[in-house]
Regions:
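Cytochrome P450
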Residues: 1-392
Length: 392
């Protein structure tokens, strides 16, 4: 079937139809991977290292010491993943964080109902920050506004380019934001956990002898992964559900596993992280192409998720259950794959579900203004803003 006449239920694709060329090199020398089989082989192999998620920002942290877990490879990475895995298992998430998620959803949506209107992405960020802060251990800030300080890391002012004065300004802005985050949020949270360790990431890092700067670096990494991306996921799912009464009724009438399956299918269609970047550490043969050592490889998550070989017919239409676990799993590559697959996938699905079931039950829920779709360089994907909701 011609892809141009297939149903396309995506909201954030900027009108682009995924290419069906599985592996190709562009004029700049970057290799693009769009086929599921090639992408999975690359991500599950040991011939690449991480090359995305603001690696240059992390490298700017003065005296950062230990390599952040996001950028570790091989045995050290496997060991750190083993040690942090207990924070993210479905059983741990359900036992430790479900009551917190319910309280946060009640608070955020209660404020929305009292005011009669609210901005959806800000509500999603408040929810995401509250959950991730508890998991990481950023719960003892000197003042409110953790969400704004996290957002600031990935706002303008951190990109390379421009003249010398602009680069100096960018460096100063970045350092100021790092120091502000450290002194207001990270340092007091570390002090609280030195006095009384808890079941969270900061306590785990301190037990391993991490310094203040090393803990700061990990908090930036978890801030990006656990807060910024979850905000977009919540917002895009709400957009689909509020706009489609039948889909909303199906979601609210389903049991939890079926609701989770629908959210995972929406994430397959609308992956928050649009591209996974890797750099080869040795020559790699992929999809019949010979990729040299040191090459940049960009895995196009949108295209991979829409590969008919894994997602079947009409891959741009919503169809929960189309990708069973033995084939790829419902989100396909939306949470990555291989050693660096997102450990917080179940956390994100559960908190989105708890928030959305509460939000969608609000009487008279409607958009005053649908989301504006923009671009987020950190995740090489969409960002949704100015999504104003109203209720009765």
């Amino acid at each position: 079937m011609d892809a141009t006449i297939e149903p396309d239920e995506r909201r954030t694709a900027f009108g682009r139809i995924p290419s069906r060329i599985a592996v190709e090199r562009d004029a700049a020398g970057v290799w693009h991977v769009r086929g599921f089989a090639a992408a999975r082989a690359l991500l599950r192999g040991d011939s690449t290292r991480q090359a995305g998620f603001k690696a240059e920002l992390i490298e700017r942290v003065p005296g950062r010491g230990k390599v952040p877990i996001l950028f570790l490879e091989g045995r050290p990475h496997h060991e750190q993943r083993r040690l942090t895995a207990p924070f993210f298992t479905p059983r741990a998430v359900d036992a430790r964080y479900r009551p917190l998620m319910a309280r946060l959803a009640d608070r955020v949506i209660g404020d929305f109902r009292r005011q009669g209107r609210g901005e959806l992405s800000a509500m999603g960020m408040e929810m995401a920050v509250g959950v991730a802060a508890e998991v990481v251990g950023l719960t003892d800030s000197r003042r409110p506004g953790l969400d704004r300080r996290i957002n600031a890391f990935f706002a303008d002012g951190l990109e390379q380019g421009g003249g010398r004065l602009r680069r100096i300004r960018q460096a100063l802005v970045a350092q100021f934001r790092l120091l502000r985050f450290y002194w207001i949020d990270v340092r007091p949270s570390m002090a609280a956990r030195r006095a009384r360790p808890r079941e969270d990431v900061i306590s785990h890092l301190l037990a391993q002898g991490y310094s203040g700067t090393e803990v700061l670096t990990e908090c930036i990494t978890y801030g990006a992964a656990g807060m910024v991306t979850t905000r977009e996921f919540i917002t895009v799912c709400a957009w689909h559900l509020i706009d489609d009464a039948a889909l909303c009724a199906q979601y609210l009438g389903a049991d939890e596993p079926a609701r989770h399956a629908l959210l995972e299918e929406l994430l397959r269609l609308e992956p928050v992280v649009g591209t996974l970047f890797r750099r080869t550490t040795c020559p790699v043969t992929l999809g019949g192409a010979e990729i040299p050592e040191g090459a940049m490889v960009a895995v196009d998550v949108r295209a991979v998720n829409a590969d008919p070989a894994v997602s079947g017919e009409r891959p741009l239409a919503r169809q929960p259950g189309r990708c069973p676990a033995e084939r790829a799993g419902a989100p396909v590559l939306s949470f990555g794959d291989g050693a660096h697959r997102c450990p917080g996938s179940f956390l994100a699905i559960q908190e989105a579900d708890i928030f959305l079931t509460s939000l969608l039950a609000v009487p008279g829920l409607r958009f005053e203004r649908e989301p504006q779709v923009g671009w987020n360089d950190l995740v090489t994907g969409y960002e949704l803003r100015e999504a104003w909701l109203a209720c009765d």
